[in-house]
Regions:
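Membrane-interfacial helix termini and adjacent extracytoplasmic/periplasmic loops
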Residues: 1-2, 37-38, 70-76, 129-134, ...
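Transmembrane alpha-helices
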Residues: 3-22, 34-65, 146-154, 246, ...
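A structural signal for multi-pass alpha-helical bundles of membrane permease subunits
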Residues: 5, 13-16, 23, 54-64, ...
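C-terminal transmembrane helix and the adjacent membrane-cytosol boundary/short C-terminal tail
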Residues: 8, 12-26, 30, 37-39, ...
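Cytoplasmic-entry segments and transmembrane alpha-helices of multi-pass inner-membrane transporters
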Residues: 26, 40, 138-147, 224-263, ...
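Interhelical loop and adjacent transmembrane-helix boundary motif
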Residues: 67-107, 137-141, 167-198, 359, ...
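Transmembrane alpha-helix signature in integral membrane proteins
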Residues: 102-116, 197-231, 239
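N-terminal signal-anchor/first transmembrane alpha helix
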Residues: 103-110, 133-162, 237-244, 250
């Protein structure tokens, strides 16, 4: 299950690394007597190792963060233990102890991974030529197509088909809508949307509100961090950026507990002071509103937005900065008049990635959501936990549809970069 869902993390980064490798390096290995397979193992694979390790790290972090899948299949994990201790037993101290233990394990993995790459550097020539394509013959062509298509079939086509069958089957057997009173068992796409009941749109609006709030804030913070590092590339700035983007390596349940405890104490202290001074109750001003959710989302997904923003900013040559200063522009004017227009594609990608991650985030939302503020992800989880799979199919398909956005954007960017290299 996790392999089919998380393999794109490794695939996308590895594909980019292999595509950017110069064919001159591989040709040099061939001139030294290496076969194509030996050249791949001894030259291409080591050069792509940082990207592959980064993809594996992302997949590992996502596995540790997962709650819905392991809960549905009844697999006892650390995240499950944190949820049951916090929400089921009300033991905050024990839940925080489990969170600290899990966080220590993650920190150890990060340290070991960085130590394994100590003093290892991989460079390649800037002289790039288009690699020669190997033309597969006879049955090898169909075997390659089958192997490449297998993850798509197992990880996308079959699950989507099953969800569609569940919707159709539930309508034909119960003559009711899978998520309410709408009649769309045999409806067209327009009739389907028109007959989707209000509760579904409420969950969709909640998800959309949280995502559209967190995404632009994350992009703005990422711009500030990346531009600050560009202007003052000091160790302090680098340390601040590493600290700010560490949240993606931390499971959502741990982030939720780490944010909920101080925000809750602040709310209690503020409420007590307001009661004593003005006889007014402020209630859960921060921890009981979407402010806490958005804050946790920013901690969790800032690294996603920062990566895209930093990559776009690094593609802008420093000569443009010098030219703008020679024309009398200050750093702020340079950012808004030169950098941001050139970074538009990267900014859009960053916003979309954060938007989709927030839409499908479950652990943080389950713990920190305000009362009666369920999202599509929470709705799917609750229905699936009750074995009401047909009712969970429509919101699940909605999340899948939103999740296709970054896939389309990244595919377009990869195609554009390949065309540019060929010209």
């Amino acid at each position: 299950m996790f392999v089919l869902v998380l393999y794109p993390y490794v695939y996308l980064l590895a594909r980019s690394a292999f595509s950017n490798q110069s064919s001159i390096t591989l040709e040099a290995s061939r001139s030294l007597g290496c076969t194509p397979w030996q050249g791949f193992l001894k030259v291409a694979l080591p050069m792509a190792r940082p990207a592959i390790v980064a993809g594996l790290s992302l997949a590992l972090m996502e596995t540790l963060n997962d709650y819905g899948t392991v809960e549905f299949f009844a697999v006892p994990t650390f995240t499950i233990g944190i949820f049951r201790t916090w929400l089921g037993q009300g033991e905050r101290a024990a839940a925080m102890q489990l969170a600290v233990l899990l966080l220590s394990f993650i920190a150890l993995l990060v340290i070991l991974e960085r130590q394994s790459r100590t003093r290892q550097r991989y460079y390649q020539t800037n002289q790039t030529t288009e690699s020669k394509r190997y033309q597969l013959q006879s049955w090898h062509q169909w075997a390659a197509i089958g192997i490449c298509g297998l993850p798509i079939i197992l990880g996308f086509a079959i699950p989507v088909s099953v969800l569609a069958v569940l919707i159709k089957g539930d309508r034909s057997t119960t003559n009711t809508s899978p998520i309410g009173d709408g009649d769309y068992g045999t409806a067209t796409s327009g009739e389907f949307l028109a007959n989707v009941p209000d509760p579904f749109w409420g969950y969709a609006i909640h998800s959309f509100t949280l995502a559209t709030t967190a995404a632009p804030i994350a992009v703005i913070i990422a711009i500030i961090l990346a531009y600050g590092q560009r202007l003052q590339p000091s160790k302090l700035n680098r340390w601040a950026i590493q600290s700010a983007t560490l949240g993606y390596a931390i499971p959502g349940a741990v982030i939720a507990i780490g944010a909920m405890v101080p925000l809750g104490k602040f709310d209690n202290a503020l409420d007590s002071w307001m009661r004593s001074q003005f006889n007014i109750s402020t209630g859960l001003l921060l921890s009981g509103t979407i402010f806490a959710l958005v804050f946790a989302y920013l901690v969790r997904f800032l690294a996603v937005g920062y990566g895209a923003v930093e990559s776009s900013l690094n593609n802008i040559k420093p000569n443009l900065d010098n030219a703008s200063r020679s024309l009398g522009l200050n750093t702020t004017q340079t950012l808004f008049q030169i950098h941001l227009p050139l970074m538009r594609g990267g900014l859009i990608s960053a916003a979309i990635l954060v938007f989709v991650d927030v839409m499908k985030e479950l652990p943080v939302t389950l713990i920190m959501r305000p009362l009666n503020y369920d999202t599509l992800a929470v709705r799917v989880f609750n229905l699936a936990s009750d074995e009401r799979l047909a009712e969970a199919a429509v919101p699940a398909l909605a999340i899948i549809a939103v999740g296709l956005l970054p896939v389309l954007v990244l595919s377009w960017q990869m195609g554009t970069s390949i065309v540019k290299r060929q010209h």
